[in-house]
Amino acid sequence: MLDIYEEEMAAEGEKIFMARSVLTEKLTPLFQKYYSLISDYAEEPCLSYVSHCQRGPLFEIIRGGRAKDRIIGHSLHGIHRDELQMCLGGYPIRNEGSQGQTKSFLLALKFAQFDLLRHSGNCKVPLLLLDDLFDKLDASRVSQIVNMVAGNDFGQIFITDTDRERLAPILAATKQDYRVFNVKKGEISL
């Protein structure tokens, strides 16, 4: 009975693996471009997709781990265990990176996804939300990000922040049209 389930899980998992591999291949150069812009070319990022499927046929890997999986009560092998590995200078950002570097990675990945969507032909310019943008980032990175998104490539952007005094001069320096909305106790005002 488990053979049938595992065969199906492996067959569908391999399809997901292929789609993720193609997506990662497309995202990686965009991610590297945006991370380099955010860090002002001071750091060397890398992005790679790590999967059990890279070690051999997924069905055999899943079946080979069945005994251990039964003991612990869940599957240790399969597509659900895949990971998008992010490194800086060859070291995993998860273990070695600062909070600012980690946030820069996530923003670069978001910008890469945005770019990919924008050029996919399936949508016009997507709406971009940068939530709590300035938290954990130094002034240089914030400046790089705001200058980058202030151009015509990004369309409409929502930036949230908890400190209006910090936000106002940064936005004014872009010389772009913008509006600041205040949200206080659920009430929105200009």
Regions found by a protein language model. Name each.
Residues 2-127, 136, 140-156, 165-174, ...:
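Conserved NTPase motor "head" modules and their coupling/switch loops across ABC/AAA+ ATPases, GTPases
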Residues 131-133:
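Walker B catalytic acidic pair
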Residues 160-162:
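H-loop (His-switch) motif in ABC-type P-loop NTPases
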